[in-house]
């Protein structure tokens, strides 16, 4: 997914002579994914005096799933059909055990390595202490610390928040999925989404019409850039399949749980029994879901782009 994000950054940057610098910079992190990136760009564009660019960021966020879903679904479907063809061929020839062993060899190695290196963290050891209220308090303290450090270092608070979150989670001081454990992720998403809406308050119907061209250019170039990066260039070899690589490239526009839902629908459409479905889910779902979660890096991209407006 990171290569797909890089493709969008390069491709949309080349459209600056067509749609303008502020439009391109505002749209790139949004296409790269993550609701917080959209909030960062709408806020930065509004403060910089570019209300149309802020509106473009908000509209891009609203539209991107409609653009990314057909490409991710069709590409994943082709990949699943190819896999199930090999699965059925091996089953009919009596070599299914060998086929499954070969297919799961690398996954088993990775799983064993992770199990061997796993350690019990402080958050896991004292899991009972981390109640919803404690987790909310930790999130608030982390947010305040990020804002304070941002004022001190002049680095965007969102970037610092992401870095601090990764550091404290890896150290085991805070539990993984802190907001989910606090049962506050839905509320936080609602608040962040509400912060985007004011970006549309200062534009007229004629302004919305003027945004059609930049919106079309951004998505057309994004699709073309992802195609070149993930299917034409040898990047697809990382995932071992051109169709899957192309589909993963669009996960940045979807995020979780959209990528999970696409995985389930594709596997249900192709599989004829539970064994086939389990096999396909083990191959399709991890690639799409991880690809969608990797788009959280767009917060870093947004922090950089916001400073360039």
Segments from the language model and where they lie:
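Transmembrane-helix bundle segments that line or gate the permeation/cavity pathway
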Residues: 2-43, 52-89, 96-98
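C-terminal ends of transmembrane helices
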Residues: 69-73, 168-181, 230-237
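Structural signature of multi-pass alpha-helical membrane transport proteins
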Residues: 113-186, 199-201
């Amino acid at each position: 997914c990171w290569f797909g994000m890089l493709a969008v950054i390069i491709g949309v940057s080349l459209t600056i002579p067509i749609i303008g610098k502020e439009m391109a910079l505002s749209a790139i992190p949004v296409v790269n994914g993550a609701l917080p990136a959209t909030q960062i760009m709408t806020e930065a564009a509004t403060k910089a005096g570019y209300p149309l660019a802020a509106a473009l960021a908000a509209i891009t966020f609203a539209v991107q799933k409609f653009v990314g879903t057909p490409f991710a679904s069709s590409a994943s479907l082709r990949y699943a059909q190819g896999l199930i063809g090999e699965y059925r061929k091996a089953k009919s020839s009596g070599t299914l055990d060998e086929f499954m062993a070969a297919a799961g060899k690398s996954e088993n190695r990775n799983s064993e390595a992770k199990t061997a290196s796993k350690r019990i963290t402080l958050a896991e050891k004292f899991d009972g202490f981390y109640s919803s209220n404690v987790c909310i308090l930790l999130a608030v303290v982390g947010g305040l610390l990020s804002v304070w450090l941002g004022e001190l270092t002049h680095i965007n608070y969102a970037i610092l928040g992401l870095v601090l979150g990764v550091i404290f989670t890896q150290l085991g001081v805070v539990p993984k999925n802190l907001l989910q454990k606090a049962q506050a992720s839905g509320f936080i998403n609602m608040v962040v989404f509400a912060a985007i809406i004011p970006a549309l308050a200062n534009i007229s119907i004629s302004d919305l019409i003027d945004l059609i061209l930049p919106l079309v250019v951004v998505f057309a170039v994004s699709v073309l850039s992802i195609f070149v990066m993930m299917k034409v260039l040898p990047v697809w070899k990382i995932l071992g399949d051109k169709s899957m690589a192309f589909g993963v490239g669009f996960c940045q526009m979807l995020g979780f749980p959209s990528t999970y839902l696409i995985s389930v629908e594709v596997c249900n459409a192709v599989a004829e029994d539970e064994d086939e479905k389990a096999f396909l889910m083990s191959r399709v779902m991890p690639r799409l879901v991880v690809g969608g979660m990797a788009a959280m890096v767009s917060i870093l991209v947004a922090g950089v782009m916001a400073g360039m407006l």
